[in-house]
Design a protein with these regions (language model features):
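Alpha-helical scaffolds flanking conserved acidic
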Residues: 322-326, 458-463, 619-623
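C-terminal capping/lid segments that line or modulate ligand- or cofactor-binding pockets
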Residues: 26-49, 53-54, 105, 359-382, ...
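The feature captures the catalytic groove of carbohydrate-active enzymes
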Residues: 253, 258-263, 347-360, 408-459, ...
């Protein structure tokens, strides 16, 4: 049933389904700039083409100053008018006619391949090679095997598509390019709309040329060159007809934000210069593409299915197999590699709707799911274009802070208006959620810890954190009695305190823990970066004093972390949202992370997990599993991960946002969205199950789930650029750990539960078996330290 060579191949035996939303089940690939979504039909094949920079609709505006209304937020809180308090700024912005709209990714076009079929096809399959990104569709018609292969070249920035057969019956089909299908134009509210885009297609020599005019007046389109080996090719005004060819190669390039007359000629010339054949182009591309995939390895020894459809059936009927979880890790990396260019959209480069639901990236949590696994996966540099965009919008973020809250520093909205940093919506969930900047700061600081890129910190990173720190310095006020900070109003997404009217739905409260942990992270990072940059002593001291004023996190009467340091608002532990778990919820350990606090986090998250069935969406479960993995509770994380995969995986392994099948685990969503962030987030979960770090502190798993009997995690990158390889065998109770640092350093190592002994350490006195720790473990520059750790056997067979 299982072939080791197929480990990096996802094979399906059915084409995309889903009726008029078939694109949601397509097989996808791309190069970060262009992407294709292959529906996989034998007779009428549709391949949807997307470009990273093609958007439509959306508008910004001039953000008015409504900071004079902030005082009304506190007044309404004091009078228990919570809903009124939450909507103060929203109403003020609406009154001044600030009505921004987020834009939508716009599909460039569809490739249409119509093939005569003489009988019901047999031996059908479609597959993705995760190492190369190549998508294949294979079938037999009257005994003759037909093969179609496509990838998006990183070498030539070209879509490369080949059709061939290996029998007496040759390749025959019609090919054209069309405007993306408009029959399913619906919003999330099931409202129909007219697309009203002017598009045209024509043939020109060996080319099919498709062009369209966007709503901003710019042109977009696609130029495809058709190359036949044998057979007869004829053309009409808008399509090519190929009969009895040995093989056909189609090369295509797209353009956006251009003028079509000039761009079409340029692309025709570029396509004519590409050197064939297909295999040569694929080899050149794979050398570049595989670097995204092979930089880290997760190997989980298990029985496996070559057929993903069977693996999914088994998953739905029972539990996810270990091999499926391993493939989900690879698939997440594939989606990242195919989508990551200067930015990533929630729909990747695979969108098939004109107004795709939730297709605008959210800077809060979603962005971190898309990128944060890359820090440990040797892909840290991929986040730099994202940081550049945030830095370019710094002036807008300052306007946001001043005009909304009357504060210094910056405010980053979770949703941004097109081509700027202003809020993209005025709903309270965007306007009141002012902790987004701390999430970006966590990414910046994590990038620094894993790359030691001090030049970036000097030029951009420190200023960004400093501006965020200034916001919290202004926003938080010192209690004269306790000498610690208070916060008169805040927003804890997306939870309503448990002690209010059951019919009320709001997230505003005072002394929200998410405010304090966010400010604490920023102040702490500023202190550390101040030392690294040799900042003035008074400046470092200022941030340290602010850090010292952050109040301790409180625990409720049941022993779980409170969401509010308040006697007015009570924590709702029946909610699946965990904003007070920052930064663990995005896979990052703060510098002051302690095992006792991590135990509190694990217990709190697991309690919420047990009490929230029926309320989950896939994002909740992804964040819970990430949090548990980051604090070392790999067993708990694995349980949540299995629930996520079992209940939200669709037929092409994309995780749906909601429970559209109504199985009872999640909140029912009839119009669930296609988003790749949860798939990529799985990579973060699985990596963090094995090992985590916080500066010079390295933490191994407390215990691994019994299902992961044997395996390895190779070439993971920790803080201080330390590389780590792990091999584990639960039955034997053995963990082999290799650490390699680029410079002389010492680290502290937290050991697994049930620790017995360790080999490979020169000084046994640094081992504290009782507290499961090793202190002052020396690493010599560019030399591998090999350790063999023995722990209690956690499985019996």
């Amino acid at each position: 049933m299982y072939n080791k060579k197929s480990k990096n191949v996802l094979k399906f035996v059915t084409p995309a389904g889903g009726f008029d939303a078939r694109w949601r089940e397509g097989l996808v690939t791309g190069n970060g700039s262009m992407g294709v979504n292959v529906l996989g039909s034998a007779g009428r094949e549709v391949i949807i083409v997307n470009h990273a920079d093609l958007f439509w609709q959306g508008k910004a505006g001039v953000l008015p100053d409504v900071s004079d209304k902030v005082k009304n937020i506190v007044k309404n809180l004091d009078t228990l008018s919570y809903k009124d308090a939450e909507t103060v700024l929203t109403n003020a912005l609406n009154a001044k006619n600030y009505k921004p709209e987020c834009n939508y990714p716009l599909p460039v076009c569809d490739f249409l391949i119509t093939t005569p079929i003489e009988n019901s096809v047999t031996e059908y399959s479609r597959s993705i090679n995760l190492e190369s990104g190549e998508v294949k569709v294979n079938y037999r018609d009257r005994g003759v095997k037909f093969d179609r292969s496509i990838f998006v070249s990183r070498q030539n920035n070209t879509i490369v598509y080949e059709l061939s057969s290996n029998g007496s019956k040759k390749v025959s089909f019609d090919f054209t390019i069309s405007m993306h299908d408009t029959t399913n134009n619906r919003t999330a509210n099931f409202e129909n709309f007219d697309v009203n885009l002017n598009c045209s297609v024509k043939t020109d020599k060996d080319f099919v040329v498709f062009t369209g005019r966007n709503d901003d007046g710019t042109d977009f389109g696609c130029v495809a060159k058709v190359i036949c080996s044998g057979g007869v090719i004829t053309k009409t005004i808008d399509k090519f007809s190929i009969k009895n060819a040995d093989r056909v190669l189609i090369l295509a390039k797209t353009f956006v934000l251009s003028q079509k007359d000039k761009k079409v000629m340029e692309l025709q010339e570029e396509l004519s210069l590409i050197k064939l054949p297909y295999d040569k182009l694929l080899k050149e591309h794979t050398i570049l593409h595989s670097k995204f995939i092979n930089n880290t390895e997760i190997n989980l020894v298990s029985e496996a299915y070559d057929n993903i459809n069977l693996a999914l059936l088994n998953c739905k009927a029972n539990e996810p197999s270990v091999s499926l979880i391993e493939k989900m890790y690879m698939y997440g990396k594939h989606l990242f590699a195919c989508s990551c260019g200067n930015k990533i959209n929630p729909t990747g480069l695979f969108n098939g709707d004109y107004k795709a639901y939730r297709s605008t990236v959210e800077n809060y949590l979603q962005l971190q799911r898309l990128y944060n696994f890359g820090f440990k996966a040797s892909l840290s540099k991929q986040v730099l274009p994202l940081f550049d965009r945030f830095y370019e919008n710094l002036d807008d973020y300052k306007k946001n802070s001043t005009r909304l809250y009357g504060c210094k520093g910056i405010y980053i909205p979770s949703l941004e208006a097109p081509e700027c940093g202003l809020p993209g919506s005025t709903v309270p969930g965007v306007i009141m959620n002012y902790n987004v900047a701390s999430y970006i700061c966590a990414m910046i600081y994590q990038y620094y810890l894993q790359t030691d890129d001090i030049d970036f910190i000097k030029e951009k990173g420190y200023e960004f954190l400093e501006e965020t720190g200034l916001f919290y310095e202004d926003k938080l006020k010192e209690n004269k009695t306790t000498k610690t900070f208070e916060c008169a109003y805040g927003y804890s997404p997306f939870n309503t305190p448990s002690n209010v009217n059951a019919n009320e739905d709001f997230c505003i409260a005072s002394n929200c823990v998410c405010d304090f942990v966010s400010a604490s992270f920023v102040f702490s990072a500023l202190v550390q970066l101040g030392f690294a940059l040799n900042k003035d002593e008074k400046e470092v001291e200022k941030w340290q004093k602010l850090l010292d004023k952050i109040p301790d996190v409180e625990v409720d009467r049941d022993g779980y972390i409170k969401e509010y340091n308040s006697n007015v608002f009570e924590t709702n532990n029946a909610s699946p949202y965990i904003p007070h778990m920052f930064p663990y919820n995005i896979g990052i350990k703060p510098l002051d992370s302690r095992r006792d606090y991590e135990d509190l986090i694990a217990n709190t998250v697991k309690y919420r997990y047990k009490n929230c069935f029926g309320k989950f969406n896939s994002a909740n479960l992804c964040d819970m599993a990430t949090t548990l993995a980051t604090v070392g509770d790999s067993v708990g994380s694995y349980e949540v991960l299995c629930t996520l995969i079992k209940n939200f995986t669709t037929n092409n392994l994309i995780l749906s946002s909601g429970d559209n099948t109504g199985m009872g685990v999640g909140a029912y969503e009839p119009w669930t969205s296609f988003e790749i962030d949860k798939n990529i987030g799985i990579c973060n979960i699985i990596q963090n199950m094995f090992i985590n770090s916080s500066k010079n502190n390295i933490s191994l798993f407390r215990a691994l789930p019994k299902e992961l009997k044997k395996g390895s995690a190779l070439n993971l990158v920790l803080d201080n650029q330390i590389k780590a390889d792990l091999e584990f065998n639960l039955k034997k109770g053995v963990l082999k750990l290799k650490l390699k640092s680029p410079k002389n350093t010492s680290v502290n190592l937290n050991l697994p539960n049930g620790f017995k002994k360790i080999k490979g350490i020169a000084d046994p006195n640094i081992v504290d078996a009782k507290n499961l720790s090793i202190t002052g473990l020396s690493l010599q520059a560019n030399k591998i330290l090999s350790l063999k750790i023995y722990f209690a056997n956690t499985i019996n067979n």
